[in-house]
Amino acid sequence: MEISSSSKKHFILVHGLCHGAWCWYRVVAALRAAGHRATALDMAASGAHPARVDEVGTFEEYSRPLLDAVAAAAAPGERLVLVGHSHGGLSVALAMERFPDKVAAAVFVAAAMPCVGKHMGVPTEEFMRRTAPEGLLMDCEMVAINNSQGSGVAINLGPTFLAQKYYQQSPAEDLALAKMLVRPGNQFMDDPVMKDESLLTNGNYGSVKKVYVIAKADSSSTEEMQRWMVAMSPGTDVEEIAGADHAVMNSKPRELCDILIKIANKYE
């Protein structure tokens, strides 16, 4: 899909739980080849970020790389397209609330998408409610951690879980890469930011155009779960990718890039 020079955007891509900027490598290359700026970030204690999971005490600290990147966007007239995958949708939501004027659109790719008037932990709570116990953790490991907020747990995604729930439609090379690079992740479900029903406002978060990309072959967050989140935020545009597993950027990178470029052309 071609783009005009006037519609080129800066995409900032945010990974999901336990992953890192590395998972966006196909999408970053395609967006840059199309003439866009594309930046994939490591959240704190993720990917190549130097912190350990027990050194990151709050969800805001975890999301700080994104918040700092959005705050620093200083090109004249530059507005960003924020793209969040899975748990990364919650970091994107926080950035939308803080910097709505800097965001042309936010794209939630098989992602947790909160809504105004409810706390940010609601999508995760609903996901757990809908998921049968035997399919929730499989061979994932729960790791005890202690940080500045006290004791808690992080999760390590197991190889069978990755193969059956996240990457079942993706190339074998991408599954192998994920097995080597995933790190323990913290969902921060007890963080005050996750429990504040007044955090997301109509004037900020609600004012930013949202697009939800439904992964129709997602074995983790089912299509029904994804549509439930869309229904909770009326006015959200919807795109669908047939055959996309949870790791949409690996199973259907070309289709995802086409959608992102279409969004860049549509929203100024």
From Swiss-Prot:
GO terms for biological process: jasmonic acid metabolic process; salicylic acid metabolic process. PANTHER family: ESTERASE PIR7B, METHYLESTERASE FAMILY MEMBER. It comes from the Eukaryota. It is an enzyme of class 3 (hydrolase). This is Esterase PIR7B. It comes from Oryza sativa subsp. japonica (Rice). Its EC number is 3.1.-.-. PROSITE patterns: LIPASE_SER. Pfam families: Abhydrolase_6. The keyword Hydrolase applies. Keywords: Hydrolase, Serine esterase. Coiled coil: none annotated. The active site is at residues 86, 218, 246. Exhibits esterase activity towards naphthol AS-acetate in vitro.
